[in-house]
């Protein structure tokens, strides 16, 4: 990487880390402290959790279209400002409805797709996977810091301090964008070209080559949500206390990123690189089979989780990098935003389905459902394979 690429990569890593740190800190404590808010109940707490994903889905594509028409840097600043407003609302209105409205505004700053498109504008193709992998690491670091620090911060400073801290972190992110992220005009459509519309975006959604990646990230996060509905319960059945679960998550996530970086820097086999998506889906299938047969065997459960995390992190990197490689600058923001929308839809539907299935199916039946989803994903991935450049 040259200096500019390194500067851009590190800047976006810090932006993603600080922004997601503000989001993740609330996860371990919302179910407990949300009940203490005015009007709080289990349904509205669930709504306050899910509404962030819904607003992300609503605003991802509009933000992507705006980033293709105007400078991406300005759109990222707009999204961070919306995130800031959402935190101020959540911290100021001490009721469950204030939290719901604030969380909606937080999600409306839907800049994930825009950031990935901006990264692709500024980073050469041969270095793009490394940059995306670095951002993936920043996600993992923010999650690990958040699940440990969130309860501690709330214990000493109160529930609403989480949102004031998140608001401060969003200001830090805006400063980083202003002073460390360069302007790029590569994405802006020329005056003599017709600016694309929602009809054009619909064509992007239905394109079978792009659809392979949309389905891929949807299925990946759909399975992740179901996985995390089942894992804590299975660990406790095996005799592993809830207080120690974070140790397994920490170890497996760190190992998975170590394997990912070794692969990125040292794997030179073209056949493996071209088929990495299907190979990872097969490994996820293998991890589910181990998990299903593990029962109360803690070692097998951890091995299964390790294989899943390695495959998950590989797919997080290579799905987005393979897609961005096939896009021209003019439409990258729109298509990457559709991709991010698919990701949040997977999270939303995965969470809904996991709760619904858990209410009337047993452990084995849910995992057979997972196996069916993985096989369906594998079939779609093979069927939709092609080469295309827009």
UniProtKB/Swiss-Prot annotation:
PROSITE patterns: MFS (PS50850). The chain crosses the membrane at residues 10-30, 43-63, 81-101, 134-154, 162-182, 213-233, 246-266, 272-292, 298-318, 341-361, 363-383. Its main location: membrane. GO terms for molecular function: transmembrane transporter activity. It comes from the Bacteria. It is a multi-pass membrane protein. Keywords: Cell membrane, Membrane, Transmembrane, Transmembrane helix, Transport. GO terms for cellular component: plasma membrane. It is found in: Cell membrane. The keyword Mitochondrion does not apply. Belongs to the major facilitator superfamily. This is Uncharacterized transporter BU466. It comes from Buchnera aphidicola subsp. Acyrthosiphon pisum (strain APS) (Acyrthosiphon pisum symbiotic bacterium).
